[in-house]
Amino acid sequence: MIYLIFLSPNIGLGESVEIYIRDQLDENRGYCLDIKGYKLKAKITNGLQAHTCYSYQGEIAVDQAFDSLKLTKNIFFLPVFDVCMESESIAVSATIRLNKCNYGKLQQFKLDIKGRIYPSSDIKLCLTVEQGQSKKGRGGSPVHLKRNLTLQPCSNALRPYQIWSTRTSN
């Protein structure tokens, strides 16, 4: 007998991790990569932002949950929404969005041992949290904070806004 096995791209998922900026900046709960919107109601068409990490509530929120196994393959995959992090281009000030996973150049990012996240095709551009004053979200107590994300030149001056880590929960 011959058995055919069809593999879904989601078979072999790793555990969920949140990706957070190591410097807490102005948010003692920390900032995590987050789909704009609220948890399951998040809208993938609105892209990614840095937002108060939800793990202070005891678990990783679905709109901040990345697949740890795919991260090792340079893919920032959000399994609940079946989308990947993508840059609009490989250029300074490019925004970060979400799209169906195609594993193309715009979706390949590396998280290196120094904590930098950069496009696999350009080690000199880092995923960067917006500087300046954060914006208030709509929920949380105290109110959650959020900031935009772009690609910027990797630099020591921007280190607090460019160094990331992963964790399974707080």
Please report, for each region that a protein language model flagged, where it lies by residue.
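Classical Sec-dependent N-terminal signal peptides that target proteins to the secretory pathway
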Residues: M1-I11
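Lectin-like carbohydrate-binding module/patch detector with strong preference for beta-trefoil
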Residues: I11-N170
